[in-house]
Amino acid sequence: MAQRIFTLILLLCSTSVFAGLFDAPGRSQFVPADQAFAFDFQQNQHDLNLTWQIKDGYYLYRKQIRITPEHAKIADVQLPQGVWHEDEFYGKSEIYRDRLTLPVTINQASAGATLTVTYQGCADAGFCYPPETKTVPLSEVVANNEASQPVSVPQQEQPTAQLPFSALWALLIGIGIAFTPCVLPMYPLISGIVLGGKQRLSTARALLLTFIYVQGMALTYTALGLVVAAAGLQFQAALQHPYVLIGLAIVFTLLAMSMFGLFTLQLPSSLQTRLTLMSNRQQGGSPGGVFIMGAIAGLICSPCTTAPLSAILLYIAQSGNMWLGGGTLYLYALGMGLPLMLITVFGNRLLPKSGPWMEQVKTAFGFVILALPVFLLERVIGDIWGLRLWSALGVAFFGWAFITSLQAKRGWMRVVQIILLAAALVSVRPLQDWAFGETHTAQTQTHLNFTQIKTVDELNQALVEAKGKPVMLDLYADWCVACKEFEKYTFSDPQVQKALADTVLLQANVTANDAQDVALLKHLNVLGLPTILFFDGQGQEHPQARVTGFMDAETFSAHLRDRQP
């Protein structure tokens, strides 16, 4: 008896194992979106928590989460920082795994108010779901002063500003600005004014007065940084809008052009004259007078300092961080003041000779400012085009530096020239791949010629017009990475094209995910993309031939031979 039971158990186990061996390779092993991303919510007066329980092997896109109130007012929602995910077609994206809890503060909600929540995710196996939309009913909430505060994300999840350089770079920029033609020649004169024309001061006294002057200048810059950062904090959400980012990028580009000498950017001459007169009334050689002179000097912007200062101020406004804003401008002023302190203590013998090299320093800072619009535009146009902009900037800078270095006659400059030329050649690679690589691929690959359909009626009409031929329907969307992999790697393969030579090819682009797209996906019982369906000559689908998820050319060719009706 025991032997029979044991034999029966083995038979049942072997049946399930062998059944798995004969499962169709294209059959869906993916769960519905509601199971992949289990959504829930809980409201307690002004506090609303949105929760996603994300199944293992699946993830949500951070940038695809949208929250829209109806008959309600909510505080600005700050999405927690996710983890980075990278693919060939969309580059780096922030995603959420496992679990996501999003607190929302409801300032006011009328009777019948709702919250529309839209989100989208994919599976690691190469399967993406259309955008999901959930409607959250809200309990009536009366506005009060406490609820008007912005929602706070737990501290460990607070997103930090992603900065292209740290505040310490401001110190180096300040030192570099000191060697521009508008600043460096003025240092001996400023040194004499600070010391009050006294030539027999002790080194310690001279250093103290110069340090006080620099601190006065730094105070002005720090105050500017705090004010701009505070203003940026109030308008942080607006400053992240694509149109605002594009506008700021244009402003940064214009500031860079002023460093290239296309036009002069400075305070009005009348205002500069008034500030200069105020500074001249102060008594040089005294700590109080020197401090006021430094504070006023911070407001007098020369053509060489206006553009970099404006660029840093606009950049600080983007961060919205007051500590960063004040610290960055303080270090910038300190960097400008260090050469002045050295000249005051050690004399003009440390001062390099004036010459064309100062104009080259000014031009170099123009390229530094140009890095900021690239950083901003990268958020709008994506990482792929952002890399191309960085490539173009690198080619321009290293190319300019190489041409400039050709004027030098010293032997060791040959090594520098080789390094600059090599850097330019390395920088041009992304542009070369874009200009020649993709074009070459497009010329050598012949893609399938699909007939586009949009609605269920158009699909039915196309099946009738097939006149007995087998039909393949490809469901495609721009947000589907695996769909693009099908186009690039599978549909371009000659063996696949040969196998589909006698097949009517249809394609439905459901990128918009509008009502017609949703109706088509529902009619076909499709969970997500990529999904490829096969119909026989009578317009009946062969469910066993359906493909979900990516297949390479070899696997897809074998699937066509085995499954296509």
UniProtKB/Swiss-Prot annotation:
Q: Which cysteines are joined by disulfide bonds?
A: 122-128, 182-304, 480-483
- Membrane topology label: Multi-pass membrane protein
Compartment annotation = Cell inner membrane
Q: Which GO terms describe its cellular component?
A: plasma membrane
Task: Write down the superkingdom of origin.
Answer: Bacteria
Note the NCBIfam families from the entry.
Answer: PRK00293.1 (NF001419)
Q: What is this protein for, i.e. what is its function?
A: Required to facilitate the formation of correct disulfide bonds in some periplasmic proteins and for the assembly of the periplasmic c-type cytochromes. Acts by transferring electrons from cytoplasmic thioredoxin to the periplasm. This transfer involves a cascade of disulfide bond formation and reduction steps.
Recorded protein name is Thiol:disulfide interchange protein DsbD
Q: Which InterPro entries does its entry note?
A: Cyt_c_assmbl_TM_dom, DsbD_gamma, DsbDN, DsbDN_sf, Thiol_diS_interchange_DbsD, Thioredoxin-like_fold, Thioredoxin-like_sf, Thioredoxin_CS
Q: Which GO terms describe its biological process?
A: cell redox homeostasis; cytochrome complex assembly
Location (main, coarse): membrane
Q: Which family does it belong to?
A: Belongs to the thioredoxin family. DsbD subfamily.
Domain Thioredoxin, by residue range, is 434-565
Coiled-coil region(s): none
Positions of transmembrane segments: 163-183, 208-228, 243-263, 289-309, 323-343, 357-377, 384-404
This entry's Gene Ontology molecular function terms read:
electron transfer activity; protein-disulfide reductase [NAD(P)H] activity
Q: EC no.?
A: 1.8.1.8
Stretch forming the signal peptide: 1-19
Q: Name one Pfam family in it.
A: DsbD_TM
Provide the alphabetized UniProt keywords.
Cell inner membrane, Cell membrane, Cytochrome c-type biogenesis, Disulfide bond, Electron transport, Membrane, NAD, Oxidoreductase, Redox-active center, Signal, Transmembrane, Transmembrane helix, Transport
**Catalyses which reaction(s):** [protein]-dithiol + NAD(+) = [protein]-disulfide + NADH + H(+); [protein]-dithiol + NADP(+) = [protein]-disulfide + NADPH + H(+)
